[in-house]
Amino acid sequence: MSFGTRRGWAPRAFPVDRTAARRLQEWLQEGGGSLDAVGLDLRGADLTGGDFSESWFSDAKLAGVVLKEADFYRADMQGADLSGADLAGASLVRSNLDDSVMRAAVLDGADFVKASLYGVDASGASFRGARLMGASLLDANLCGADLTDATVMENSFRVRLDETVILQGFSGSIFGPVEVSTGEKLTTIGGADLEQWIRNKGGTVTVISRSQRADRH
């Protein structure tokens, strides 16, 4: 598999930070490949459609950055700040997003298959139509998130939700339980109770029990 920039691709806008802009320009001149953007401040950039497969964005500042339809296959984005970033239609297959911040990010139609999202804060994020099959969501905060028409399949889904989360059309199967926040109180819900709670919000999800999970391995 060949990684790097798509033929003729260029950022629609470069980062405001000079160091980050210079690094991005150097990467383009080098012909693409894996971009080392560890810790860089990429705010202000529009990187729509860029190919960042197997690149490094750990601890990078990507708040508000436009990343629509960008490819982050196997990218390391651990600890990155993606608050308010626009990743609509992006591919994050097998990416590492552990401990990243995605508060209020737009993730509509994004592909998270087999991605790792341990400890992610995605409160208020929009996952409308996102593909989350096989992704690991452990200790993730999805309070206030919009999961309309999002799809899961045998996902580790130990997450925190609240009454404002939108689950209309949310479908597939998960390994629970989840924590539901109601004010200052946290309630753990699993099994049939979790299925019913999701159903009451317009979703159709099967919660796989521990015994069923063991039978699958």
Description of each model-found segment:
Residues M1-H217:
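Tandem repeat scaffolds
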